[in-house]
């Protein structure tokens, strides 16, 4: 989802430039699901080895949170010692109210995500900071 790189960039720039707020589109209530790319790769390998044929299987975390909740978490991870407030631009759209996959079939086949969002966000941020140097 595009909101992750955008959120990381906004928080990083606010931290770097000593800004006291970030601006997010909408009201922050839209819900999203995140899955780290390594988890998707592991799921692909898992299901290739299972030899599941002719079956569509949703791969995701199965857990959603609001954009506001993600923003607070990302702020805590990226700028833990800074006071950066979240402001909402209500003139911009909220987006789809909720995006979360039903992963019950994947679970039925024995797969479940290893979902540690804090670690995944930290890895993503570390990768981002290496790339922008």
Stretch-by-stretch model annotation:
Residues 3:
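The catalytic Tyr-X3-Lys active-site helix of short-chain dehydrogenase/reductase
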Residues 6-7, 11-133:
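C-terminal substrate-binding subdomain of Rossmann-fold SDR/epimerase-dehydratase oxidoreductases
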């Amino acid at each position: 989802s595009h909101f992750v790189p955008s959120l990381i960039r906004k928080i990083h720039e606010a931290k770097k430039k000593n800004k006291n707020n970030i601006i997010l589109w909408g009201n922050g209530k839209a819900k999203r699901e995140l899955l780290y790319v390594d988890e998707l790769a592991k799921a692909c390998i898992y299901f290739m080895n299972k030899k599941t044929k002719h079956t569509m299987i949703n791969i995701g975390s199965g857990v959603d949170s609001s954009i506001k909740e993600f923003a607070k978490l990302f702020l805590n991870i990226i700028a833990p010692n800074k006071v950066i407030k979240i402001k909402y631009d209500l003139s911009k759209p909220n987006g789809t109210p909720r995006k979360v996959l039903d992963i019950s079939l994947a679970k039925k086949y024995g797969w479940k995500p290893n979902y540690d969002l804090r670690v995944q966000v930290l890895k993503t941020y570390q990768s981002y900071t290496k790339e922008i140097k």
